Amino acid sequence: VPGCENIELIEMASRLGVRETRHIKGQYKLTTEDILDRKHFEDAICTFAYAIDIHNSEGGGATFHQVNDYYTIPFRCLVPEKIENLLVAGRCISGTSGAAASYRVIPCCIATGQAAGTAAALALGEGCEAGDVPTEKLRETLTRQGAVIKD
């Protein structure tokens, strides 16, 4: 594939159903505490409330923390710290393993994907880097598209 000549496969799962994957180092790292404290960010791109369920990697049992209210995911979690003009979505956004145990599910992957795609389109229109899109404009556009972003 052109442009991918230097890509190296570091690791892959031995079976389907892997819950924990790699996460980028983003402009902000979402933490378990952010989720349990129901933190709301000014640059929020989605609202979410899935429980934190950490499955034992050795098999049998899980740690479960109910999320009693919603939290938000900031746009900065989609923006890599050192790579310009790239956005990520889904399980690989910037966060701790504990936080990922909540945001790794499909509805959140869809919401972060919508935010990343919308931000990329806005960046083209604004003539700026993807990570420099005005977050208020991004939030307004996502809301017009039907995204739920609570303050």
Feature locations, PLM:
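Flavin (FAD/FMN)-binding glycine-rich loop and adjacent Rossmann-like elements that form
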Residues: 1-151
